[in-house]
Amino acid sequence: MNQTMGGYSPKELTIGTESQEKLLHGIEMISSAVKSTLGPMGQTVIIESPHHTHGLTVTKDGVTVAKSYDMDDPVGNLAVKMMKEASSRTATAAGDGTTTAIVLTEALVKEGMDRITGDINKTDVLRYLASETELLVRD
């Protein structure tokens, strides 16, 4: 039976733990690709790119790697898109730190997921993250 949501019939409905796992997987995948470029010992990445010489782009720039990354799974790709947006905003605002922003976001999300799946009050976790974020931004 296909249920409609506000007149819209979804192709696929993903809820609960399954959606959390898919979102986390998307974050882990883009972070894995990007974090390999981190720091002075970071690795060069080769990206298939029809717009460049011989169809390839060779880069050590995390935001370039992030922008080129996509997933087939629409839920995982939603997380990838959010990470791309965060890295692009970091690049625009600071001019650097895109790879670090993605790696830190992955760590925060993983820690948050560990807390949420435990016996801790989810609202308390969100309040704590909001207060810590405010302190970091202020300092």
Protein language model regions, located:
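N-terminal glycine-/lysine-enriched basic segments
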Residues: 1-139
